[in-house]
Amino acid sequence: DDAKFYYGADGKRVNYIGWQLIDGIYYYKEGNQFIRNQSKKIKGDWYLFDLQGKMVTGFSTPEITSEYDDNYYYYGNDGRRQFYTGWQLINGKWYYFDESSRAAKGWKTINGVKYYFETITKATDEYNNEYFVGNSDHFMYTGYGIIDGEFYYFDANGACQGIDTSYTG
């Protein structure tokens, strides 16, 4: 049987149904088992539970569940799936979501502007060049760009080639 049970500090099995807060982590119990390795609609909202049954927050990734479909979806701090579209500022970083609420990844052209997205880590290419998407203007630098008062040089693909101390603008 694939059942997983939890026991309280008193050594007794937890038998409650519904949301469970165990050691600061939320789980959801249905029948005699905790929901694991799947998304679940609960009272009108979608939640994702990992292989151990922990409620997921942040971006879904392949390591979280075997239900993963090679797309990134975002779950808020309360665990509810967010059905974002367009540009979203999350924890100080910009992300772009398509009409199906999937976070953009790889190269995308949006409103005629080319961007490179890596949803979980910084944007890089296969050569580990770094890319920069401006926090307010949503653009990809090519040529010289100023970031935090420093002059950087970006190649035609937007790959950062480093700080240029000789450039005066």
Protein language model regions, located:
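Extracellular adhesion/carbohydrate-binding repeat motifs centered on closely spaced tryptophans
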Residues: 1-169
